């Protein structure tokens, strides 16, 4: 043991000396930093010493205020806790009922559950969705033409016409026109003294026709039928070129526009429609050709545009365009 102590003691002493030297060296190297840290700590302690009483006083005041608030609102707090407990119970019951409803729906119980499980209803809804999709495609490919034109007739009479033409495909179209006619409905009134007065009654007239296209001698022939200026009428258009077609209209078989002229024949109008460009056109021809005393020439000019917005509106409100 003595030998071991004699051997290890010098090593231990050398190590302690080295540690002492290293500690002295570190203290010397960081003496300035240690001095700054000590100085800063002393400043902090001075501030804490000054502020600590104020902080303690504030904490005491806060505690008193909290106690006062709790005492003054004890009843309200109790009511709030009771209300919160009831709300929690209501939520629990609602959750239970919701779980029961979902379970009934899943098993097909109740009216709604039967509806959800009804295969026939599902098939009907599916068919309805397909029909809506098909209708949307029809609206997408439908062309809508909006037009305005004015026509001048014998003796200075005139017409103003607003037209809407729906073209779902190349084989057919629908024509709607609102007509303002300066000639109006002409009739005579006789007075007791023998005088006779010619009067006119003015009101808007409407045209609503269905048109179908056919091929004739390599050209397009369009046949139209329906309502023409508030009376039954038929018509035909024959395209001699892409921008020109001949037209004929026969309507007003009862001559409601002249009720006192008993021998009048229907109004027959024949003419040519000529597109100057894509939107501008002229049309002219003969009017009332079957009645010699009313027969005359007419001419007109009009504008026509393709409207992409209005066709979706018409499709959305259920106007049939197929």
Curated annotation (Swiss-Prot):
GO cellular component, as recorded: plasma membrane
InterPro entries the record matches: MlaD_Phospholipid_Transporter
Gene Ontology molecular-function annotations: phospholipid transfer activity
Listed GO biological process terms: intermembrane phospholipid transfer
PANTHER family: INTERMEMBRANE PHOSPHOLIPID TRANSPORT SYSTEM BINDING PROTEIN MLAD, INTERMEMBRANE PHOSPHOLIPID TRANSPORT SYSTEM BINDING PROTEIN MLAD-RELATED
Stated name of the protein: Uncharacterized protein aq_493
């Amino acid at each position: 043991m003595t030998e071991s102590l004699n051997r290890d003691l010098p090593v231990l002493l050398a190590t302690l000396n080295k540690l002492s030297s290293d500690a002295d060296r570190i203290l010397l190297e960081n003496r300035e930093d240690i001095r700054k840290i000590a100085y800063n700590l002393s400043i902090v302690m001075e501030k804490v010493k000054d502020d600590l009483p104020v902080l303690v006083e504030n904490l005491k005041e806060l505690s008193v205020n909290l106690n006062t608030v709790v005492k003054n609102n004890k009843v309200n707090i109790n009511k709030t806790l009771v209300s919160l407990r009831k709300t929690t119970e209501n939520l629990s019951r609602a959750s239970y009922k919701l779980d029961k409803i979902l379970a009934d729906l899943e098993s097909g119980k109740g009216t709604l559950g039967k509806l959800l499980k009804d295969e026939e209803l599902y098939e009907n809804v599916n068919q309805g969705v397909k029909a809506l999709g098909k209708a949307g495609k029809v609206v997408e490919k439908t062309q809508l033409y909006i037009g305005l034109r004015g026509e001048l007739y014998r003796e200075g009479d005139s017409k103003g016409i607003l037209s809407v033409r729906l073209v779902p495909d190349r084989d057919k179209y629908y024509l709607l026109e609102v007509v303002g006619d300066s000639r109006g409905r002409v009739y005579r009134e006789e007075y007791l003294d023998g005088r006779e007065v010619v009067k006119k009654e003015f009101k808007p007239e409407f045209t609503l026709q269905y048109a179908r296209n056919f091929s004739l001698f390599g050209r397009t022939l369009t046949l139209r039928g329906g309502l023409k200026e508030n009376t039954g009428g038929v018509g035909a258009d024959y395209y001699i070129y892409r921008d020109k077609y001949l037209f004929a209209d026969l309507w007003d078989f009862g001559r409601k526009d002249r009720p006192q002229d008993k021998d009048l024949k229907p109004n027959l109008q024949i003419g040519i429609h000529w597109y100057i460009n894509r939107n501008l056109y002229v049309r002219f021809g003969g009017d009332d050709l079957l009645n010699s005393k009313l027969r005359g020439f007419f001419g007109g000019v009009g504008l026509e545009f393709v409207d992409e917005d209005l066709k979706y509106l018409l499709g959305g409100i259920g106007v049939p365009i197929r």
